[in-house]
């Protein structure tokens, strides 16, 4: 994300040169993982490794295929965004190492935790009295470890145990991103809260397929609230860029990963070899398709598949894209339809693993 383009380029090349140096080993390791998936799927009488992976959560194959098909139809929107990025950065050629630099510098706004809490509460008023009462109870009732501290792990996390309220770990640092993280993690926490309130222990967990919906829906509602109430032009540009990057990174990028997994597993199931040359070629073709003509697809990016750890947990990443899509759709439904949509959403939060 460095504003210095030469630093971005050098970091990009240095990173992928390390993976390229180990390409034979990593390709053999990934190929073994894919072949293992294919073997166990065949041994257990599944039609494919993808069918076996999705069966754990009773997800139809059509969900996976429809995601890829629908996102592929929407690729012109990503191409427009890439072209906009090229224009805004003012470069003759946009490269892969230009994708992560912010189009708008981080908004120089300090948001203390108390202000972040108030803003999140205000944004989520649309969720109705029951949800907001639980939200306030969690925020004020000792659920959250707010600030960075010596020996404390980084990042953010929501965790809990049935029969006890959820706990939320934050490392709030007064940034806009920290405020979104608060909304996100409280979405997870309240998902658990409403499930535990209604379901017995047997059904008190959530599948990954739905877990990110509750957290991302809160983020989407916060974003809509901020865009509606913010008057400062620079701040609005920052928020819009933040939102667009979520679509690029969560919907489009994760679907590209999902498509890569689908193809590599199909190759293995047909007895085709999985070599670094073949996977580099495939990954390059996907990047060319997804990002369009406005960007130079650098040779170094061909090996990016080698650094994605999720690929060793086959057919996992698609859930980021479906979860994000569902969250955006639900947030719009809540904003447009009001109480009936809120009631249906709270019912969803209360289901756990019961259905």
Where are these regions (language model features)?
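Conserved helix-loop functional segments at active or binding sites
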Residues: 122, 126-133, 159, 188, ...
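Active-site recognition of the HExxH zinc-binding catalytic motif
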Residues: 45, 172-195, 215, 220, ...
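Short beta-alpha connecting loops at secondary-structure transitions
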Residues: 167-171, 198-208, 237-246, 265-267, ...
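Structured ligand/cofactor/substrate-binding pocket environments in proteins
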Residues: 11-14, 18-27, 171, 175-185, ...
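Active-site-adjacent bridging/hinge elements
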Residues: 46-47, 51, 93-96, 154-166, ...
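Post-HExxH zinc-binding segment in Zn-dependent metallohydrolases
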Residues: 206-235, 243-245, 249, 323
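C-terminal, non-catalytic "cap/extension" segments appended to globular domains
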Residues: 58, 87-97, 182, 190, ...
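Contiguous, non-catalytic segments that form substrate-binding/exosite surfaces or channel walls
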Residues: 4-167
